[in-house]
Each structure stands twice: as C-alpha cells, then as structure tokens.
From Swiss-Prot:
It catalyses: (S,S)-drim-8-en-11-yl diphosphate + H2O = (S,S)-drim-8-en-11-yl phosphate + phosphate + H(+). It comes from Aspergillus oryzae (strain ATCC 42149 / RIB 40). It is an enzyme of class 3 (hydrolase). Pathway: Secondary metabolite biosynthesis; terpenoid biosynthesis. Its EC number is 3.1.3.-. Belongs to the HAD-like hydrolase superfamily. Induction: Expression is regulated by the secondary metabolite regulator cclA. Pfam families: Hydrolase (PF00702). InterPro entries: HAD-like_sf, HAD-SF_hydro_IA, HAD_sf, PGP-like_dom2. Keywords: Hydrolase. This is Sesquiterpene phosphatase astI.
Length: 201
C-alpha cells in the first residue's frame, strides 16, 4: 500500500549523489596529476560547453588540451580514469526504491553530464539507472545547472507544480535556483540526512 506524500516527484543529481568517484580504487598506474587534471578540466568553460552538447568528445579533449597546455591524450586518460573510479551509492538507491514503492513518487535524474557520459552510464550501470522514470542530461537539453532554462525545461516535461517536487543536489548554488523556482530544495549531505528531509514532508 502506498502512502500519500506532500510531494509527487523527486529530482536527483547524479554526480556526488547517486554516483561517487572513488579514487582509492584507481589502478596503481593512476598518477595524482591525472586526478588534478580531471578536476581542473571539469571547471573549464570548454567542459561546460561539452556538458551542453555543444562540442564532440574529440573537440572537448582537443580544446581542453590547448587551454591547459597538455596533450589531448592526457585529457582522455583522465576522463577514462573517472569512468573507472565511478561507484554507485547503494544506500541511496535502496532508499529511493523504497520511496517509489511505499509513497508512489516519480523519480527523475537531472545532471550536468555530456551525451557520451550519460550513454555510458545507461549502458554500464543499467541496474542503477532503471530507478529513474526519466533522465534529463544537460548534453541533450542544451543547458546546464545552475542555468534557469535547464530547470524550466525539466519542470515542463514533468508537468507538476513546483511545490510538489523535491530537488536534491550536492551544490548549494543549484539548490538555490531550484528554491527560487518554488521547488523544495535539499542540498545533499548523505542518505540519512536526506531520509530525514523526505520522510518529514
């Protein structure tokens, strides 16, 4: 039997919420500078364009290489490393499945993620990704968080009033935009903290 909730849908971020990067599990050949290069790359305007679907993977690697003065092959190696270190958050996934079953809520993913990476996740993590009723990736939408257009596009697709939707993200700036649009925003601080939020509303 399902219990009626005040909210009808949950929007979850993927990175650092549903999935985490566990660099302790990287192969022994992984150098610290690869991890540093990855972090620097992901903060770059070039990578943000890649996340919006404005660049191909090859173009992204080439332009990042030019801007960071490294060989594009090193950029590719850094991103391959990120894929290898990706781990799901089983406690969160179990809780979300429980919510879907007991409260009948819809669950969506909304993530700043390039087309190639979301397709990789759908293929390599199919069992985890099936928890979502729909996945909204910046690479296909053409905008990224915290850009308001991304939120409006997602809410238009969901078709619910903002106050009936919970938005969960690990970045406060993204949560602030959601709150400004009327959603119930939660900055992710762990599964138990999220459980307290969602079971209390």
């Amino acid at each position: 039997m399902t219990r009626q909730s005040h909210y009808q849908a949950i929007i979850l971020d993927l990175g650092n919420v549903v999935f985490e990067w566990d660099t302790s599990q990287n192969p022994p050949t992984a150098a610290p500078n690869q991890i540093s290069l990855l972090r620097t790359s992901m903060k770059s305007p070039v990578y943000h364009s890649y996340e919006r679907g404005q660049l191909s993977t090859e173009e992204c690697h080439r332009l990042l290489g030019e801007s960071l003065h490294v060989d594009p092959g090193q950029i590719k190696e850094a991103f391959d490393l990120a894929r290898q270190s990706l781990r799901s958050n089983p406690a969160l996934l179990d809780f979300i499945r429980q919510l879907k079953q007991t409260r009948g809520v819809a669950v969506y993913a909304m993530s700043n993620i390039p087309q190639a990476e979301i397709e990789y996740l759908k293929e390599s993590r199919a069992g985890d990704m099936e928890v979502f009723d729909e996945v909204f990736a910046s690479g296909y939408v053409g905008s990224r968080k915290p850009e308001t257009e991304f939120y409006r596009r997602v809410m238009g697709e969901i078709g619910l009033k903002a106050e009936r939707v919970v938005f969960v993200d690990d970045k406060e700036e993204n949560v602030d935009v959601a709150r400004g649009l009327g959603l119930y925003g939660v900055c992710f601080g762990g599964v138990e903290e999220l459980r307290g939020h969602l079971l209390g509303i």
